[in-house]
Swiss-Prot record:
Record protein name field: Transducin-like enhancer protein 3
Natural source organism: Homo sapiens
The record's account of how the chain is modified after translation: Ubiquitinated by XIAP/BIRC4. This ubiquitination does not affect its stability, nuclear localization, or capacity to tetramerize but inhibits its interaction with TCF7L2/TCF4. Ubiquitinated at Lys-720 by UBR5 in response to Wnt signaling, leading to substrate recognition by the segregase p97/VCP and degradation by the proteasome.
Family: Belongs to the WD repeat Groucho/TLE family.
Location in or out of the cell: Nucleus
Gene: TLE3
Length: 772
């Protein structure tokens, strides 16, 4: 009955064999269970040991690959230097006298004849020096195991004979140190040059740049400066005059003060490539690799500044210091209120591991477990039309082993294949360290909506059967009109009843009558602020007779729309150099403005006076919304916080800390839920009292604007990735998605939830009809 090797049953003398009492049978079963439990424990210990060894092997593999790749690059570099020096010598030698020419020629020939003995001696000396340096700075060097089975990693040429000494990793400590230093210099160079490019402007975001200075200043190597100059030269080859206005709102990595408004030609980012970040690194090699860079907003705000000599604010760099110190996905400093860690710094468009390998080794431990990289062209198992998202950014199967290993160790997306340009820097599981079991739901389809519990546990959301159906839930949206504003459209709003659309651009607001199909020209133009200053926000009072406009100036303009021709009724002047967002109280008596200095100004519209300032944000306040009953205000800032304010008592109620800058937010008209758009490309839906939340991952870049439908059942978000996404409240089932030709900077929904208007970086606004 029992196999051999099991514990024998206790046998009492005086009784026939195999006749047990119930108690003896229970004892036997207990012994068997304890035996199995001991076996299970030993197997589990063995499994954990093997898992740790596997993780360590993956880290070693990537480190080995990094060394090999670095040496390969260095070899090609030195070869090219030698060729150029030879050319120079050949050009100079004819100027020498005949005898000197012969002497120099002989010396050159002798220099070329390096014997293996000399080479080995040189290598040994270099290794000794490197080991001394490693011991002095980082302790004993890390020794890597040989590649398993003696095989070379894919893409690495085999190393032979004495040259194998080049791959000795005794200097790994110093190599890692140099890697960190190079990365730091590269980021700081970006920050320094961006700041210098904005110094010529009357910058309303001096305080914004000030927050950048804490990231440290160091001496920049000549090599880093040279790389930056080469990047600019390469970008200038693809300049397009038609795109010059785009970078006024969207940062296109053109930091040359002499040419502040030139941006490369753009096309839709079919591969989901994060252009802004790739441009911040090494210069691209083709126009395709800088596609859509002109529709790339800076990471400082939802485009709170521009590289323009006009009075436009300067921004934080689009390559922020990576915040990889988050212990778990979604960690925040407030218990129970967690957010995704920031995206890793820029990724090169070349299909090799250069960018990923530039990351310091020390940050890999959090992301040791490999996880599934998958597309999210379908929702969490319930999308009715998968074709709607087809081609968003699928990862082809020919992913190389080295790239996959690097992705596992670094928590980054693997490159598609060596030499390929396109890859997705923001898959659903980007850099979160989530186990692969969370990458999909039981149906096997990729997940993009996750529920985050109070303790930070993330689980894919199983959508209810009525997620995409039911009263008040749209089926899709149809584009019905394009309003050619002529400048980048940073602000839009729709009148109630739905007839007029207001688009804010550079120095003016244009009014469009959308009740007449095919209308191609505005019915009125409201010139406000200065001619070169951008409108950031425009809000209608509930009666539709008054429009309030704010932007890159210290004044808010109040327009009387009821007069025969619109006229300026009043101007409100604040101490802040810019206003980034506006909100109106439901009773239309008070206006709230988000200031570039972080304060929230409260204005009495009847007396046209400043009555209060909410102080708390340590950096610019970028977005704002007010509760339906007018008792609570929500604000988001570039200090990575979302704050709520009690308007009756005039005090701060809550603060939610994140690891990413906040670019947009919206409060559900029916209460309870607050949706927040991040620089990290996530949308997070928070409950106003409970600590758990939802995290949505369909955007591939910064989420620049967000608006709830008036019914509260759905909301839309727009981003630097050219996408307009519609989500179900609160769990984020994707209702529909529309892709535009440039960054979508602003959006609004009509009061009857039948129309959506978006403003984009290609100087137009788009009107959508919502189909139910």
């Amino acid at each position: 009955m029992y196999p051999q090797g099991r514990h024998p049953a206790p046998h009492q003398p005086g009784q026939p064999g195999f006749k047990f009492t119930v108690a003896e049978s229970c004892d036997r079963i207990k012994d068997e269970f304890q035996f199995l439990q001991a076996q299970y424990h030993s197997l589990k210990v063995e499994y954990d040991k093997l898992a740790n060894e596997k993780t360590e092997m993956q880290r070693h593999y990537v480190m080995y690959y990094e060394m090999s790749y670095g040496l390969n690059i260095e070899m090609h570099k030195q070869t090219e230097i030698a060729k150029r020096l030879n050319t120079i010598l050949a050009q100079i030698m004819p100027f020498l006298s005949q005898e000197h020419q012969q002497q120099v020629a002989q010396a050159v020939e002798r220099a070329k004849q390096v014997t293996m003995t000399e080479l080995n001696a040189i290598i040994g000396q270099q290794q000794l020096q490197a080991q001394h340096l490693s011991h002095a700075t980082h302790g004993p060097p890390v020794q890597l195991p040989p590649h398993p089975s003696g095989l070379q990693p894919p893409g690495i040429p085999p190393v032979t004979g004495s040259s194998s000494g080049l791959l000795a990793l005794g200097a790994l400590g110093s190599q890692a140190h140099l890697t960190v230093k190079d990365e730091k210099n590269h980021h700081e160079l970006d920050h320094r040059e961006r700041e210098s490019s904005a110094n010529n402007s009357v910058s309303p975001s001096e305080s914004l740049r000030a927050s950048e200075k804490h990231r440290g200043s160091a001496d920049y190597s000549m090599e880093a400066k040279k790389r930056k100059a080469e990047e600019k030269d390469s970008l200038s080859r693809y300049d397009s005059d038609g795109d010059k206005s785009d970078d006024l709102v969207v940062d296109v990595s053109n930091e040359d003060p002499a040419t502040p408004r030139v941006s490369p030609a753009h096309s839709p980012p079919e591969n989901g490539l994060d252009k802004a970040r790739s441009l911040k690194k090494d210069a691209p090699t083709s126009p395709a690799s800088v596609a859509s860079s002109s529709s790339t907003p800076s990471s400082k705000t939802k485009d709170l500044g521009h590289n323009d000599k006009s009075s436009t604010p300067g921004l934080k760099s689009n390559t922020p210091t990576p915040r990889n110190d988050a212990p778990t996905p979604g960690t925040s400093t407030t218990p129970g209120l967690r957010s995704m860690p920031g995206k890793p710094p820029g990724m090169d468009p070349i299909g090799i591991m250069a960018s990923a390998l530039r990351t310091p080794i020390s940050i890999t431990s959090s992301y040791a477990a490999p996880f599934a990289m998958m597309s999210h062209h379908e929702m969490n198992g319930s999308l009715t039309s998968p074709g709607a998202y087809a081609g968003l950014h699928n990862i082809p199967p020919q992913m190389s082993a080295a790239a996959a290993a690097a992705a596992a160790a670094y928590g980054r997306s693997p490159m598609v294949s060596f030499g390929a340009v396109g890859f997705d820097p923001h898959p659903p599981m980007r850099a979160t360290g989530l186990p692969s079991s969370l990458a999909s739901i039981p149906g096997g389809k990729p997940a993009y909506s996750f529920h985050v519990s109070a303790d930070g546990q993330m689980q894919p959301v199983p959508f209810p059967h009525d997620a995409l159906a039911g009263p008040g839930i749209p089926r899709h949206a149809r584009q019905i009109n394009t309003l050619s504003h002529g400048e980048v459209v940073c602000a839009v709003t729709i009148s109630n009843p739905t007839r007029h659309v207001y688009t804010g651009g550079k120095g003016c607001v244009k009014i469009w009558d959308i009740s007449q199909p095919g209308s191609k020209s505005p019915i009125s133009q409201l010139d406000c602020l200065n001619r070169d200053n951008y409108i950031r926000s425009c809000k209608l009072l509930p009666d539709g007779r008054t429009l309030i406009v704010g932007g890159e100036a210290s004044t808010l303009t109040i327009w009387d729309l009821a007069s025969p021709t619109p006229r300026i009724k009043a101007e409100l002047t604040s101490s802040a150099p810019a206003c980034y967002a506006l909100a109106i109280s439901p009773d239309a008596k008070v206006c709230f403005s988000c200031c570039s200095d972080g304060n929230i100004a409260v204005w009495d519209l009847h007396n046209q006076t400043l009555v209060r300032q909410f102080q708390g944000h340590t950096d610019g306040a970028s977005c704002i919304d007010i509760s339906h009953d007018g008792t609570k205000l929500w604000t988001g800032g570039l200090d990575n916080t979302v704050r709520s304010w009690d308007l009756r008592e005039g005090r701060q109620l809550q603060q939610h800390d994140f690891t990413s800058q906040i670019f947009s937010l919206g409060y559900c008209p029916t209460g309870e839920w607050l949706a927040v758009g991040m620089e990290s490309s996530n949308v997070e839906v928070l409950h106003h009292t409970k600590p758990d939340k939802y995290q949505l991952h369909l955007h591939e870049s910064c989420v620049l604007s967000l608006k709830f439908a008036y019914c509260g059942k759905w909301f839309v978000s727009t981003g630097k990735d050219n996408l307009l996404n519609a989500w179900r409240t609160p769990y984020g089932a994707s209702i529909f998605q529309s892709k535009e030709s440039s960054s979508v900077l602003s959006c609004d929904i009509s009061a009857d939830d039948k129309y959506i208007v978006t403003g984009s970086g290609d100087k137009k606004a788009t009107v959508y009809e919502v189909i139910y």
